[in-house]
């Protein structure tokens, strides 16, 4: 009996850390000071966990910030926890590109190609809406990607920069939620 009790306690101590990071849709929605809604459309929402925003590099014009975001998919009835690292280059932000380019067409072309932000998703865990792990965690090893302007990844990068420095990296859009 003592052996079984010790074994049960050992299993519980091992499993508690695995479930402590679980998050539910209600927790995201009911804690707006901890989880900031940064993106929303008909198929999903994206939140950034304010407690996870961490400046890794401050070397103007270059900045690196990490944060955790939660992408809610209403299409697939899951939410994904995304551990991201964002790379910022102020020499290529929208304001700088406005000054550098000679025409609207050139500006539009450059902004859609690269507006000074890249990101890497380091780890993904997928949950159901009640917080039960559906898949993961999945560790990723990929090169940095350029997010599309106004995409969930772009808005999370913009918010992480804003929250870190109390200034916008790029000019805020009309649909921006912060």
Where are the regions a protein language model picked out?
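N-terminal secretory-pathway/extracellular module detecting exported/lumenal segments
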Residues: 22-84, 89-178
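Short, Lys/Arg-enriched N-terminal segments with co-localized hydrophobic residues
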Residues: 1-3
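Sec-dependent N-terminal signal peptides
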Residues: 7-16
